[in-house]
């Protein structure tokens, strides 16, 4: 929340996007572009969302869904890292947001939350029930958690294999590597 608050003069009274860099998304149409189109439909605050297995829901912020409209859901609430078995849905919040300038006003009023920091999610949650509301958007694409070493490596391989100029060499290398690994077992 503090980083967004520091940008308030640049943002002014306009809707704005927040991109968390550890969430990398591969998509034919960029995730943020998909969300802008959805935002233009609703005018409401928008968070990217993806379905996760129940066993992994406790690792995410999870949406409490009011109404499911297909690619979008209206939100009753957000539960940060719910205890297993208590998650209100399997729809997890991912690091892409399009927010109204009202969120900045909410940030101005918020006291420090988790970890002694001003939490952006608290400011977004204050928009639930307003005329703007909060929506989850089920983006089309594949998300990689580059906040973990494994996720970073998965993204690197996936993006490498998606490129015409890298695919053949990378595929040959990975095939050889796996054959060597299997032979060593």
Please provide the spans of the model-predicted regions:
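Alpha-helix boundary/capping detector
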Residues: 26, 33, 129, 153-154, ...
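Catalytic-core segments of class I nucleotidyltransferases/pyrophosphorylases
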Residues: 17, 36-40, 69-172
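Intrinsic disorder at enzyme termini
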Residues: 170-185
């Amino acid at each position: 929340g503090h980083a967004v608050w520091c940008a308030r003069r640049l943002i002014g009274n306009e809707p704005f996007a927040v991109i968390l860099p550890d969430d990398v998304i591969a998509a034919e149409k960029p995730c943020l572009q998909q969300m802008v189109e959805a935002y233009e439909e609703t005018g409401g605050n928008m968070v990217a969302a993806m379905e996760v297995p129940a066993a992994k829901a406790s690792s995410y912020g999870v949406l409490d869904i009011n109404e499911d409209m297909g690619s979008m859901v209206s939100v009753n609430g957000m539960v940060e890292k719910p205890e297993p078995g208590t998650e209100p849905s399997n729809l997890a919040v991912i690091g892409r947001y399009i927010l109204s300038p009202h969120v900045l006003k909410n940030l101005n009023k918020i006291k420090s939350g988790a970890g002694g920091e001003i939490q952006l999610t608290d400011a977004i949650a204050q928009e639930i029930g307003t005329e703007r509301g909060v929506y989850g958007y089920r983006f089309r694409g594949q998300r990689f958690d580059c906040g973990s070493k494994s996720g970073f490596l998965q993204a690197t391989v996936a993006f490498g294999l998606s490129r015409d100029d890298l695919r053949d060499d990378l595929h040959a290398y990975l095939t050889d590597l796996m054959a060597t690994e299997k032979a060593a077992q």
